[in-house]
Amino acid sequence: MNQRFLQITTLLFALFSLSKSSAQSVTALKTEYLVNPIGLDSTNPRFTWQMDDASQGAKQSTYRILVDTDSASLIKANAKLWNTGWVKSDQNLIVYSGQLLKPFTKYFWRVDIADGNNKKSNKANIASFETGMMKMENWQGSWISDTENTKLKPAPYFRNTFNANKKIKSARAYIAAAGLYELSINGKKIGNHRMDPMYTRFDRRTLYVTYDVTDAIKQGKNAIGVLLGNGWYNHQSTAVWYFDRAPWRNRPTFCLDVRLTYEDGTTETIKSGKGWKTALSPIIFNSIYTAEHYDARLEKTDWNTPNFDDKGWKDVMFRSAPSKNIVAQALHPIRDVEEIASKSIRKFNDTTYLFDLGKNISGVSKITVNGPAGTVIKLKHGERLYPNGHVDISNIDAHYRPTDNTDPFQTDILILNGKGKQSFMPHFNYKGFQYVEVTSSGPIQLQKEDLVGYFMHSDVPVVGEVKSSQPIINKIYYATNNSYLSNLFGYPTDCPQREKNGWTGDAQIAIETGLYGFDGITIYEKWLADHRDEQQPNGVLPSIIPTDGWGYEWGNGPDWTSTIAIIPWNVYLFYGDQKLLADCYPNIRKYVNHIDETYPTGLTTWGLGDWIPVKSKSPVELTSTCYYYADVVILAKAAKILGKNDDYLKYTALAKKIKDAFNAKYLNKEKGIYNTGIQTEMSVPLYWKIVPEESVALVAKNLAKRVEADGFHLDVGLLGTKAILNALSENGYSDVAYKVAAQKTYPSWGWWMENGATTLYENWPIDAKSDISMNHIMFGEIGAWLYKSPGGIKPDEKQPGFKHIILDPHIMEGLDNFEASHIGPYGKISSAWKRTNNGIRYDITIPANSTASINLPVNSGASISVNGKITSSNKIDLAAGKYVIEQKVGK
């Protein structure tokens, strides 16, 4: 089909059903990727929206943004701070460039759009955002703590009272902490966040959180309470990463401003400092790594209420700020996202019970129990059981180095006060577990309903969905998402129990899985800021981020710390937003330059290699050089995007040098085999596109043969799992990839599912003796592959952010139907197909203001129709709208 015919066909598809056009509106208004956020520090926040128009071919032609402090003015289309006027553009990501924003101010913004027929959106669409401190000098409160040292175990309470003598219009609490905190006013906890603030390199960047506390404060006398936890700041548990020796370590501290705005327009700030009192709480020990201990006999009832008698409390100690960079926590918070009832209970005797949640999670348990004062309840959390039915934690405590027996791993301790039923749930800890073994120092009676679990993680919106006709695929997808979320706590982790570390290798493997399934840009922007904090002057990054200093000498290298390039690049592809790529550009360049200077031949042996392979080991130089090449290619592309032409030329040449050196050493061109031809050695070069174009077909063919010879089972480690399915699918062997993905016998993802897994594991054998966490995300690329291959949904590098969508669904033997959807920046993309009596039916949805190109499988003699209209090409351009495409095989 010639290009002219394609254009005509596309136009026809765009015009089809215009008579059925629907009302046009603007939805999903966000500021900095959050809905009506408060406490932003950005002087130039980003505005995003979506066009809601089901008409075929719907497209935004112009937009207008209005910003003001008065929402009523915006309804009348008046704006004092910023009025862009009608801008001819189809973009929906715009950076604010109006008048200078002021701190502590609520702003409203409105966006109006028009389509190609100048039909304007049908109502005023108004959102808001509110600035926070914006500058360090705007803080009025002092950093305070108690007078204890880092070795003291109980967590401290802090309190103060104040009078609000006028009618309050609004009130905001701004709280920064090194450690963790819970804020309360007049006896009630503020907000539903958990584990605030997020973990950072405390001596380089500390986060603060803003709360709307208008409804919590009453006219008259009020009380503020703060409970501090250790978090990663005062790590008292000892393990192989030496967080107990962190350079920032100190007793937890906080700074608080509560800003009151009265109805008469005046303001008042209640601040931390002189007059505050402190005492020890009933939390007699808390470790984010191990557990929490609580002595209910020490409870101070109503300690955070106005009339509490605090005469016995001590004065606070003033402290210096933990860093010179106190910035807003502008990201999706950690929450108790799902309450999970116990699936079963087993009673061993009157002092020992086992609860099973039915699935492996990250989070906490909550127990409700009654017993005599002084009764000690221990709640041991684990992922698996011994044959006798008791909880086995030997797979997750391998790196723990306790100095005594007072802090058992993943074991909460509750001491009862004898005052009837009481409930306990940790404040400053989370664990990875499915089972909870409850033991008591004396007889107790428990029912199944007495213990529930809470699945805790960063509460990122779900934006993806996968469904298939094959149950094993559905189980794998479910388990992959469980592991992804179990390892998202303001930064991506490897596992929620044994380590809780921000391992870079695991995160670069899972980045696409995360972005297809969840709206995670705010988490990754925060974590890449952690990268920038941790990078050494020579460009080296540690293998875990954040870190106390561990990881600069082991575990890092391009196969792990390529996160500095791979994650910003993927965020750019998925969101069409250059900011993270631009913010990290100097760091990527510094990193690449370090490798270039250290390994001038273009080949590097720096890295861990294909971690935890099934059986075959690939040379570290082979895999690390592929990642080095990927970093340089990303750097060159970023240079071009950001207008740095000299860098573009420089790093394009460096990429060629690496590619030539790599293929000269490892590629047998005649045979089409890399090194010895095992799965990782063949798939990693294909995936990262370092294979010479003329050799791709033969290398892919040999990879498919290798996989078939391996019985369609995996023979890869961490790096190979990122590549294997994609390398096959992208090069004509999607059926082979599917046989691997849907495999149910060892070694495979399905093997885990067949043995009861609800998450992904760290090792292929379920009876491995080491490296056997049962909730790891490092083999999680299969989640992204389901979107890319059977789903066929891919971003277009030339029009990122799914402005243009590449649809390339692969019809695979063994699947009768498949559905994938992803809510991108422009709306919901749907790609579904099913087998019919005479072919394949595709149901496609392209969101308004975007376009797509679909590549259908070549099938000689088949007829293709789009919404009932026959076309002669298997490559079809689509405007926005819904399509039924039928590919029928002639008799």
Segments the model singles out, each with a brief description of its role:
Residues 25-498, 505-506, 522-525, 542-549, ...:
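Extracellular/oxidizing-compartment recognition motifs
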Residues 149-153, 190, 198-202, 212-214, ...:
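Alpha-helix capping and helix-loop boundary segments enriched in small/acidic/polar residues
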Residues 171-175, 185, 364-383, 439, ...:
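Alpha-helical support elements that line or immediately flank enzyme active sites
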Residues 180, 271-280, 443-479, 485, ...:
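Active-site acid/base region of carbohydrate-active enzymes
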Residues 224, 294-296, 499, 517, ...:
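C-terminal capping/lid segments that line or modulate ligand- or cofactor-binding pockets
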Residues 246-257, 269-307, 327-338, 735-891:
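Non-catalytic C-terminal accessory modules of carbohydrate-active enzymes
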